[in-house]
């Protein structure tokens, strides 16, 4: 149990460290490039990936049977 708690705490710390470093890199990039250039970045370019599900009707029936 102690090992699981320690691993969980380490995972939370590493995820926090990752998010802070990502924010630092983006802030540094914003300072180098300029705020006007970053406003034109198209952050919605990945929305097309999630428009239509790739699961067929047969797969949905199988999953419904599996989860009963």
UniProtKB/Swiss-Prot annotation:
Prodomain residues: 37-68
Keyword terms, alphabetized: Cleavage on pair of basic residues, Cytolysis, Ion transport, Membrane, Secreted, Signal, Target cell membrane, Target membrane, Toxin, Transmembrane, Transport
Keyword Transit peptide on entry: no
Function: Antibacterial peptide with activity against both Gram-positive and Gram-negative bacteria probably by forming pores in the cell membrane. Also has weak hemolytic activity. Does not show antifungal activity.
Tissue: Expressed by the venom gland.
Signal peptide: 1-23
GO BP annotations listed: killing of cells of another organism; monoatomic ion transport
Main subcellular localisation: secreted
Record GO cellular component, one term: extracellular region
Subcellular location: Secreted; Target cell membrane
UniProt keyword Cytoplasm present: no
UniProt similarity note: Belongs to the non-disulfide-bridged peptide (NDBP) superfamily. Short antimicrobial peptide (group 4) family.
Annotated GO MF terms: toxin activity
Name by which UniProt lists this protein: Non-disulfide-bridged peptide 5.6
Superkingdom of the organism of origin: Eukaryota
